[in-house]
Each structure stands twice: as C-alpha cells, then as structure tokens.
Regions:
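Paired acidic/hydrophobic, glycine-rich loop segments that form the ligand-binding mouth/hinge
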Residues: 97-106, 245-251, 266-267
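Conserved C-terminal helix/tail region of periplasmic/extracytoplasmic solute-binding proteins
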Residues: 33, 341-374
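Mature extracytoplasmic/periplasmic domains
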Residues: 282-349
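Short, polar/charged alpha-helical segment
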Residues: 34-45, 51, 55-75, 257
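Short, low-complexity disordered leader/linker segments with a strong preference
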Residues: 1-47, 374
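Periplasmic-binding protein-like
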Residues: 218-222, 227-229, 262-290, 331-334
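A ligand-binding cleft/hinge motif common to bilobed small-molecule-binding domains
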Residues: 111-114, 246-266
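Extracytoplasmic ligand-binding site segments that recognize negatively charged/polar headgroups
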Residues: 51-65, 77-91, 99-236, 240
C-alpha cells in the first residue's frame, strides 16, 4: 500500500510538472508583439474609452458599437459633424491644452489643410501593432499615404466615386451618358451640387471636371441654376422627394436612408469621361498626446484589420484597399473598389486626395468655385 501511495504521489508530481511545463511553453510561445498587444488592450480597458471623429452615419455608429465595443470592452465616443467644424474644434482645443480627441477618420482635404499644417499629428505607422495591419502584403498597393511625408495620413480606402445620383422617376440614366448632357435646358433647376467651396466630395468632383472639361464648362454648369448646399441630408432628401433630378457630390451613405426606405434614388452609371478615384472617408490620423493612447492604438488596429475594414466599408458603401476583404458587392450600389478595376499605376494617375493633388488641382478648383459662386 505504501508503495502504491509512493508511486501515486510520484505520478501526481510528474503530472503537475508536465502541466507547468505546458503552461510555460504556451507563455513563451506568445510572440513579444502578441504579449504587448494583450497589455495594450488591458491598459485600454482601464482608460475606458476612445474619442473618434468620424463621418455622419447611423449605420457606422451602430456597426462600431456591435463589433468594436463588444469585442474589446472599450467605449467609443464618436464625434460627428461637418469636417471643417469638427477639425477646427480639434485644433482650437489642442492649442488651448485640452486633450480630448484621440483620432480622426474622414476625408483627406480637411486633414491636409487643417491638421497637418498645425503639427498636431503623430505618425500612424508606430501605432500599427497587429501583423495583419502593418504587413503591406495585406494591402492593395501596399501602404498608401496621403501626405507627402508618408507618415501622418493613412489612406485605407480607394474606389471609383459614386458621387452622381439620380431620381429614377425624373431621369433615365441613358439621358446622361456624358457630363455635357448636364448642360441641356431640361435639367435647368433640377441639379444639386455639394458646395465645392468647402472640402469634400463636391470639391473633388468639381476639380475633376475642371481638369477634364475646363473652366468654360463649369461656367455653363453654374448657369444651370443648380441648388448648391452644404447640408448633405437636405440635398439627398430633395433628390428622393423629386425636387431634384440629379445630385452631384454625395456618396452612398448620404442616400442610403432614402434608398432603404424604398424611395426612387440610384447611383448614375459612370459617364463616358470616366471619374476620379477617391479615398472617401477612410483617411486615418492620430493626434499627438492623445487622451487615451492605448485605446487609440486598439481602435487603429481594429479599424485597419480585416474585420474593421469590412465593417467600415459596408457601413459607408466605400471600397477598402485590403486584399482579404470582399468588395465586389459594392457594384450593386454603383461603387467600384480600385483594387477590382484599375492597376496601382492607374490609381496614382486618377487619385485626387493626396496632399500634392490637393495643393494643385483642388486649390485651383476651389478658387474658381469661389469666383463663380460668390
């Protein structure tokens, strides 16, 4: 009996030793990066929240709550509004010593003109922790940056713009196969345009038309008595209710509530002159000295991950550059991801959101818009 107990205790000792060895091996098998990621999540949960400036979209807010907040246990405090207003607030608060915002995701022009010159941004790449995020092989075109320094404004999306939408009861898409068709008398007073004097897709389309059609064309277009506004919802509502036949410069998410409600709005097939490639609302910047540095890092890595890009792309109807995220479904809403339609070389020729393009083509377009519209 004593011998049995002796062997039994020896067996238990060996079993415990093996278990400890397995645990130690499992712990050592964790890469340093994974260990640091776990610690970052733990610290982020203690911070409790991340403050993100994002585009106005109820679908996006709901998707972030469903996927990010439940996954990581970190609250997201979204700040929404017109980019020019929100970014001005970010600059003013930062200069006064207030550290409230952690990061901003939106269009490129506001970031280039408002945040970049003020020196308020930290490089994005050091915040990329997950291998699936920082390895360029997961991204069509590799890592693409908006700013000339290729450090501060990361471009996660690239798609051919869906910025022409029409009311199916007032316009047959075959009637507008060229931008020249918009100059016909029948469309006078029936066209809406997102104000090209302010940063956004209205300015993007306007500068593209200046490039391919020239100043005289834009003079004639202005003569069509267009409804020009900065309220995207109001423009989309006027289209859905039949007050306008066509609206220029609004993306899918502006029209989505009306489309989902069964109102007669659709994206217009691309005119024969083609269209520019947009980075949409997918430009990411991180603030210097963020209030919640760990929560910021967790959000950045989730946003740039396969899951985050799929969620963001579907909520806004814009095409991600991630190669492992399906974007073919976007064609159903009149959007084509750049990775599904053009080469990387063509992208650099057609894109219009880089700092260089903003300082040349967009600045010229904005100056002409102010001249013709004021």
């Amino acid at each position: 009996m004593r011998a049995f107990r002796k062997h039994f205790h020896l067996w238990l000792f060996c079993l415990a030793s093996c278990a400890n060895a397995v645990c130690a091996a499992a712990q050592s098998a964790k890469s340093p990066g994974q260990t640091e990621w776990d610690k970052t999540i733990e610290r982020a949960r203690k911070e409790g929240r991340v403050v993100v400036s994002i585009t106005t979209s109820n679908d996006l807010r709901a998707a972030i709550e469903k996927h990010f907040e439940r996954k990581y246990g970190i609250d997201v405090e979204p700040v929404i509004g017109r980019a020019a207003v929100v970014l001005r607030k970010m600059v003013d608060e930062y200069k006064s010593g207030v550290r409230y915002f952690d990061l901003h995701i939106g269009g490129s022009e506001s970031a280039v003109n408002s945040l970049l010159p003020e020196g308020l941004l930290d490089p994005v790449e050091p915040t990329m922790m997950l291998p699936e995020v920082k390895d360029p092989k997961h991204w069509w075109g590799g890592h693409i940056w908006t700013d000339n320094a290729k450090r501060f404004i990361y471009s996660s999306l690239a798609h051919q713009s869906e910025s022409l939408w029409y009311n199916t009861q007032l316009l047959n898409p075959q009637e507008v196969r060229s931008f020249d068709d918009l100059l016909l008398d029948k469309w006078k007073g029936k066209i809406g345009l997102l104000d090209p004097r302010t940063p956004g897709s209205g300015a993007s389309l306007w500068s593209y038309l200046l490039d391919i059609k020239g100043e005289e064309y834009l003079r004639k277009l202005v003569g069509q008595q267009m409804l020009i506004g900065r309220d995207q919802r109001l423009l989309a509502e006027n289209l859905a209710k039949g007050k306008l036949a066509l609206v220029m410069g609004l993306g899918y998410y502006s029209h989505a509530p009306f489309k989902k409600a069964g109102l007669p709005v659709l994206a217009l097939p691309t005119p024969k002159e083609g269209t520019y490639i947009s980075g949409g609302s997918g430009h990411l910047v991180v603030m210097k000295q963020p209030a919640n540095p760990n929560a910021m890092r967790v959000f950045v890595n989730w946003f740039l991950s396969k899951e985050g890009q799929d969620v963001y792309s579907r909520a806004l109807g814009q095409g991600t550059r991630r190669l492992d995220v399906d974007t073919h479904w976007l064609r159903e809403i009149g959007v084509i991801a750049a990775k599904d339609s053009v080469s990387v070389e063509q992208y650099y020729r057609l894109e219009n959101q880089s700092e260089n393009k903003i300082n040349t083509a967009r600045e010229a377009g904005a100056a002409l818009a102010r001249k013709l519209l004021e």
